[in-house]
Amino acid sequence: MRQDAGLASIHNNELNTGRQISALLKKDLLLETRQQHTFYGILLYIASTIFVIYLTLEDPDASTWNAIFWITQLFICINAVAKSFLQEAKGRMLYYYTITSPVSFILSKLAYNAVLMIAMSIINLLVYTAMLGNPTSNYISFCMIGILGGCGLGLIFTMLAAIASKALQQASLMAILGFPLILPQLMMLVRLSKTAFGEIFNNGIPLQMIALLLAFDLLMIILSVILFPFLWKD
């Protein structure tokens, strides 16, 4: 009987966590639709950044095209994801503290920002291709890598934004914490993207890099779930 009660309790907790995540995701979507100036601001940032690159380079070679795409992707992620915690007022966070668990809260933020960055990656890629051309030999492959990279960057900066939101110098702290985490991932994404330009790798190398990127994303989720409850109590 005790075992059955324990299993029922676990099942109920899982249901509650799922409902909390769903409700928090709906809340973030509702805020995004009500505060459309933020979304349009990011779109303007994408268009203006790529337009400046177009005016400067016009017809970049494949290596430059690839490198600048990921640099653009990085700064888009900083602008899009950093606000997820910075816009939350202290009173609102106190309210969340009373109605949801820290795990549900951080998982909802991770999921929302991952989806947001997938959308931003697609938009960035379309605008980038329209203005700077398409030197890739396998555009679909590059799109998939871009989506994978955007999702991973979103997960990293969600965790960093959660940590930085508890500090005074939030932007500086995000830059300091983010550099050692972002650099290896960006280097791997740039290298993996070269497969879409026709560069030949040894058998299994691209799959190994994809597996490493997915493992890194999973590590970010696990670390967020472990560390965020301590920030939640602060």
Could you describe each region identified by the protein language model?
Residues E32-T33, I78-Y96:
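Transmembrane helix boundary and interhelical loop/hinge segments in multi-pass membrane proteins
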Residues G152-M159, Q185-E199:
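Transmembrane alpha-helical segments of integral membrane proteins
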Residues T56-P60, L126-I145, S193-I210:
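Membrane-interfacial helix-loop-helix connectors in multipass membrane proteins
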Residues I10-G41:
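Aromatic- and glycine-rich beta-strand/loop motifs that create alpha-glucan
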Residues P102-T129:
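Selective transmembrane-helix segments that form parts of the transport pathway or gating/packing helices
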Residues Q36-E58, I68-C77, L177-M188, F216-L223:
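Hydrophobic alpha-helical transmembrane segments of multi-pass membrane transport/permease proteins
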Residues A130, D217-D234:
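Junction motif at the cytosolic side of a transmembrane helix
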Residues I147-F179, W232-D234:
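A structural motif at transmembrane helix-loop-helix junctions in multipass membrane proteins
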